[in-house]
Amino acid sequence: MNTSRFIAACTLLASLSTGLLFPPSAHAQSNGISKVRISTSMGDIEAELYADKAPRTVANFLQYVNDKHYDGTVFHRVISSFMVQGGGYDAKYQQKPTRAPIEHEGRKALAAGLKNTTGTLAMARTGDPHSASSQFFINVVDNAFLDPTPIPDGDPVAKFEYQGRVYENVARSQLVNAPQLFGYTVFGKVTSGMDVVQKIRSTPTGAGGPFPSDVPKTPVLIQSVTLLK
């Protein structure tokens, strides 16, 4: 199958859209592991952030923490069989301004062992892989389908399997740049407070603000996010 048919045959995975789209930009890298406390109206969540595996993503998140961007935001999207998402809207469901988005690091993070498993933190984005800014989500189940799709060696790629179909002799650049293959960048993991995540996960949802569904009927407030180390 030729490359144009491959791209046409693929469906775009954009279920974790932030509703924002900006040109990509890079942020300074940092090293090591940081720890943050996410204080919510349902309790505290602590998480490790892996700057050694997703440096731009962690630096971006910590800059928002330093700017107190997350203080007073809500978990605006809760799907009990999927994830809980927040970091972009205030308690009145007004979208907060953000800095320019960051370069996607999902493949780098995946190669370093970070996958969308239960309890991990990942960046939300639009259909553009390089559109993540402030919004993040916590996986409440294993979501392997959100992981970046590995690209086999070779150019053209002799054989590539995707969504149950096999494609042959596909130009490598078409696969590397195909938006639907990027997945979502994991950058941290909950180390304590999964019981709080479970409470958020279980909260009743419905329509709210600009959203037709999946909004907690009782707002789940992010009171603050604090860097512990």
PLM features: what roles do these ranges have?
Residues 3, 10, 20-229:
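Cyclophilin-like peptidyl-prolyl cis-trans isomerases
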Residues 8-12, 16:
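Hydrophobic helical h-region of N-terminal Sec-dependent signal peptides
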